[in-house]
Amino acid sequence: MQTLNFPTYEFRFKSNENKRYIFDIIRKKFVVLTPEEWVRQHAVRFLLQDRGYPQSLMNVEKRIQINHLTKRYDIVIYRPDGSIFLVVECKAPQVGLTQEVFDQIARYNLTL
């Protein structure tokens, strides 16, 4: 996988049926290792290890309703009272930060 602009972290991997998997410590399971998942797992580790957010207040791929459509946040950090504190949208390294990407986050923000 591509080197990212994050500190170096130790990850658990496995391979099965010509697919590579990475262990997600939040979901507590192996997930298919895609370029976006690679970014998401680095962001999770950064938030936990380098920024000190508690794992108990973090959720990955949280589903939400936006205008009667189900969408997913990549990473959500909650306040102790259960309200959303931080939303992280991850993109594969080769995905550009276009207006469409900014619009996606803006739509998520409207539901908060």
Roles of regions detected by a PLM:
Residues 1-112:
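A short, conserved, highly charged catalytic patch centered on acidic carboxylates
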